[in-house]
Amino acid sequence: MSDAAAAKRDAGFRAADMVKDGMFVGLGTGSTVFFAMERLGERIKSEGLRISGVPTSYQTAQRAEEYGIPLTTLSLHPKLDIAIDGADQVSPEAFLKYKP
């Protein structure tokens, strides 16, 4: 695994470890989020973690189902407890930047 992939995996796992039982979790799209979903799936199996994921894309919904993450919609649960997504850049002031 490359250094960049290892850093994304670590970030994803750390984000997933912030999720608590009963939370509604926004799930973005991309490699870092997919690592977070991998870890959430592990926690669901090993700890009995009970969460509901709200995916931002069809691809994310498919991956979440593969990891055993129960899903809901933003229409049914418009208030999320936490959202996990990646960022293209972070400024020194900790602002996230998107590069189209």
Task: Give each language-model segment a name.
Residues 1-87:
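N-terminal active-site beta-alpha-beta segment that forms phosphate/nucleotide-binding
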Residues 80-100:
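Ordered, amphipathic secondary-structure segments that act as subunit-interaction surfaces
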